[in-house]
Swiss-Prot record:
This is Large ribosomal subunit protein uL11. SMART domains: RL11 (SM00649). The keyword Electron transport does not apply. It comes from Ruegeria sp. (strain TM1040) (Silicibacter sp.). GO terms for biological process: translation. One or more lysine residues are methylated. One of its GO terms (molecular function) is structural constituent of ribosome. CDD domains: Ribosomal_L11.
Amino acid sequence: MAKKLVGSMKLQVPAGQANPSPPVGPALGQRGINIMEFCKAFNAKTADMEPGAPCPTVITYYQDKSFTMDIKTPPASYYLKKAAKIKSGANNPSRETAGTVTAAQVKEIAEAKMKDLNANDIEAAMQIILGSARSMGIEVK
């Protein structure tokens, strides 16, 4: 017999740093998900990722209190800020630039994000990343 789906939720958790403290613990606890089981499973799955990288995670939970999780790659903005060596994007991206990245760095980011992007080839993925860079005020050379 199939498990009865109760719901799903999205969290952004730093890679390898899931712990029962807020905001993870209360979000899981109020839905009846075993917090320690989630933390151990999440940290094990993200052990090979860069520690502290924000990982969007979709958690689907069932009536028997079990769950499945889909861990996605960190957001494009995280990769772009890291490549441009900046803390945040421009306040007014149309008038000011926050930093610069090279086309090679954009391609590298697009390759890393390819499985999570809605793109058929690397060129389309690069266009998506370029759009993110433009909206953050990051210039591409």
